[in-house]
Regions:
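Conserved structural core of kinase catalytic domains
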Residues: 1-29, 101-107
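Short, solvent-exposed segments of well-ordered alpha helices
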Residues: 3, 25-32, 36, 48, ...
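Conserved kinase catalytic-core helix
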Residues: 24-53, 58, 67-68
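Acidic, Ser/Thr-rich intrinsically disordered and amphipathic helical segments
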Residues: 11, 15, 30-33, 37-40, ...
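Extended HEAT/HEAT-like alpha-solenoid repeat tracts in very large eukaryotic scaffold/adaptor proteins
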Residues: 2-9, 86-91, 138-145
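Catalytic activation segment of kinase domains across protein kinase-like and atypical kinase folds
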Residues: 54-138
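Helical subdomain adjoining the active site within ATP-dependent kinase catalytic cores
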Residues: 121-176
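Short, flexible/disordered secondary-structure transition segments
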Residues: 19, 49-58, 63, 68, ...
Length: 176
C-alpha cells in the first residue's frame, strides 16, 4: 500500500496565454477585468489559507466561457462589479503553493534543499537556521505575474524606455 494523490480540475476552455497570443488582442477593459478577477481570487485564497501560489504566470491562468455579464465581489466592506467579457478566469497549478489548512502549513518539496526552488524561502519545514529567515510573501504572486506580462508587452528590455509614456497612460499597466 502507498498513498495516492488525485488532483481533479474543472475542464477549462483555454489559458490566458492563448488569449494573448491569439489573433485578437485583449482590449484594455478586457485586461482590467481579467486582472481584477485574478486579484480577487488571490485575495480570497490569501485571506482563507495564508496562500502563496509561487508560480503564477499567464499559462497558469485558465478561463471558462460564461454568459454572466458581471461577477460580484465583496472585499473589506466594498462591493465590486467586474465585467466578465464572456470569461471567468481560473488559477491553476498549485504544485508550488504554500498555504495553511487547519493550523498546519503545507509546503511543496520544491522548497526542500534538493528541490528546484530551494533558495526561494527559508522557513519551516525546510528552515536553515544558519541563514536569515525568509517567509512566503503574498505579494510574490502578483510580482511573478507582472514579470510574465512585462515580458509579453515589452519585446526587448533595451526598448523599455519607448514604452514608458504609453505605460503611464495605460490603466492596465498601472494595475500591473
Amino acid at each position: 500500500n502507498f498513498p495516492v494523490h488525485a488532483i481533479m480540475m474543472e475542464k477549462c476552455d483555454n489559458t490566458l496565454d492563448s488569449l494573448m497570443c491569439g489573433k485578437n488582442e485583449l482590449t484594455e477593459p478586457e485586461w482590467a477585468a481579467t486582472l481584477l478577477q485574478v486579484i480577487m481570487a488571490l485575495i480570497a485564497y490569501q485571506h482563507m489559507f495564508a496562500f502563496t501560489h509561487n508560480d503564477l504566470h499567464t499559462n497558469n491562468i485558465m478561463f471558462v466561457k460564461t454568459d454572466k455579464v458581471f461577477l460580484h465581489y465583496l472585499h473589506k466592506g466594498t462591493y465590486y462589479r467586474v465585467p466578465t467579457h464572456g470569461r471567468i478566469m481560473k488559477i491553476i497549478d498549485f504544485g508550488r503553493a504554500i498555504y495553511k489548512y487547519r493550523g498546519k502549513t503545507m509546503v511543496s518539496d520544491s522548497f526542500d534543499r534538493a528541490g528546484d526552488a530551494a533558495t526561494q524561502y527559508n522557513c519551516e519545514p525546510y528552515l536553515n537556521p544558519k541563514k536569515p529567515r525568509l517567509d512566503p510573501n503574498p505579494s510574490f504572486d502578483l510580482c511573478r505575474l507582472a514579470c510574465s506580462l512585462f515580458d509579453y508587452f515589452v519585446e526587448d528590455i533595451r526598448d523599455a524606455a519607448e514604452y514608458s509614456a504609453t505605460l503611464k497612460e495605460s490603466r492596465v499597466a498601472r494595475m500591473v
